[in-house]
Design a protein with these regions (language model features):
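A short acidic (Asp/Glu
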Residues: 145, 185-190, 303, 311-313
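A short, conserved, highly charged catalytic patch centered on acidic carboxylates
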Residues: 1-174, 189-192, 235, 239, ...
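Loop/turn residues immediately N-terminal
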Residues: 181-183
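Preference for the N-terminal adenyl/adenosyl cofactor-binding alpha/beta module
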Residues: 1-67, 138, 197-422
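Charge-rich, low-complexity amphipathic helices
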Residues: 98, 103, 188-189, 205, ...
Length: 422
């Protein structure tokens, strides 16, 4: 067996994501590939936008918490839309004579004032030439809950359901949902219209993040993001295409690596046998259980990426018991070039402990019990009675946890969240 030589050993520091991407795009694409696009290279227009947005927030933050939906729109959301180049090019849904809004999106977004003015008809607003739609809620209103509050225009309505209904009704591909602080993008092009979205916390961006991180708001929510180019596609369309292309590339890469991972695992289990013991029956056991171990590892990588295991909500779980932490430690070991033991089974013990925790669950760590049998020692006793030494297991996990990005010419953590959504 030969060690992999095609991967650049450099281990870049994983950059913090100043966005919440729920399967709409690829995290890796957003963090590593998008900054190489020419659209990312914005200058004074961006710095002016950020300065104006910060000034707007600072001037309104003390009163926003007490405003109702209509007041939030007038005092904050509409000024933000103006900063995003939508001034004079959006239609605001008006109230009926009874003072209640009809069931249409709050905003229809147009490429210019001429297109906007042509969209007023006797039957109502014509959305045919609209770039997209937007819906607004009062400051910090939960966007995934139905609730009744006097600050709401509509009572007991789930805003995320609402925006999807509006997108479907208007047949627009892109929609914005905001409570002033959180800004979300939804798309009819997503695999799951409701579950997949892209979210920015503008307060966090303005007060905690580097200035450049605000590009993740500016580039994605400004009017130019919805304007089609000569190819008929918008900036958001291209980001979605780039994310999908990366996901396909990654899926092919992981499938190819799986064969080599099984080879590592088979060699690892075989090492505990005498040559005379490697009978056809034992070799079949080794191969079958190497596949089971591969499935376990992939299951946990996917589960952690999708927050089915509490990585972001439980620090103890993340730092002491997760495959994320094991893989992170292994990446450092691999990059340092340290010799791996042919006797130690430290890492096998670590993953087996994690598998046991998943099988039984752990309320103290908020880990739910998995009763599908994959992690059951009764169904797979071989994996409890055998072990793989670090020399074989460490590179196997490294192959599943880090991947070479041909465009960046570096290795990065595998974006399993992207794979899990496709």
């Amino acid at each position: 067996m030969t060690k992999e030589t095609s991967i650049n050993p450099e281990l870049p520091e994983e950059s913090k994501a100043w966005f919440q991407n729920h399967g709409l795009f690829s995290d890796h694409f957003l963090k590593e590939r998008l900054p190489e696009w020419k659209e990312w290279q914005v200058g004074k227009e961006f710095s002016d936008f950020r300065a104006n947005l910060l000034a707007l927030y600072e001037s309104k933050k003390s009163i926003l918490i007490n405003m109702n939906e209509s007041q939030t729109e007038k005092e904050f959301i509409q000024p933000v839309l103006n900063l995003l180049s939508y001034a004079n090019s959006y239609i605001v849904q008006t109230d009926t004579k009874s003072g209640v809004k009809v069931n249409h999106p709050d905003y229809a977004l147009y490429p210019d004032q001429v297109s906007k003015d042509k969209s007023y008809t006797a039957e109502g607003i014509n959305y045919q030439n609209a770039l997209g739609i937007a819906d607004a809620k009062y400051w910090e209103r939960p966007l995934d809950l139905s609730k009744s509050n006097e600050r709401d225009t509509f009572s007991n309505v789930n805003p995320s359901f609402q925006i999807i209904n509006y997108l479907t009704g208007t047949q627009k591909n892109w929609g914005i949902l905001t409570n002033g602080r959180l800004w979300r993008l939804y798309s009819l092009k997503a695999n799951s219209h409701l579950a997949n979205y892209y979210e920015i916390d503008i307060v966090q961006l303005l007060l905690e993040a580097p200035d450049s991180a605000s590009k993740y708001f500016y580039l994605f929510f400004r009017k130019q993001a919805l304007l089609a180019g000569i190819d008929g596609k918008t900036f958001l369309d291209h980001v979605l295409d780039g994310s999908n292309d990366y996901a396909i590339e990654l899926e092919i890469n992981i499938k190819e690596r799986a064969y080599q991972v099984v080879e590592y695992l088979c060699h690892g289990f075989s090492a505990s046998y005498l040559p005379s013991e490697l009978t056809p029956e034992n070799l079949k056991d080794i191969y079958d259980n190497s596949l089971i171990l591969l499935y376990r590892l992939l299951f946990v990588f996917y589960a952690e990426a999708r927050e089915l295991l509490p990585l972001s909500t439980n620090k103890s779980c993340r730092e002491n018991y997760s495959l994320f932490k094991i893989a992170k430690d292994i990446a450092v070991i691999t990059q340092s070039g340290n010799t791996l033991s042919l006797k130690s089974t430290i890492y096998y013990s670590k993953i087996n402990s994690l598998f046991s925790l998943i099988n039984t669950g752990d309320k103290s760590l908020n880990v739910p019990e998995y009763n599908g049998g994959l992690f059951s020692p009764q169904e797979h006793p071989f994996l409890d009675s055998h072990a793989i030494v670090d020399f074989f297991l460490v590179p196997a996990i490294q192959h599943l946890s880090r991947v070479y990005d041909s465009k960046r010419r570096q290795t990065f953590a595998v974006d399993y969240k992207t794979l899990s959504e496709r």
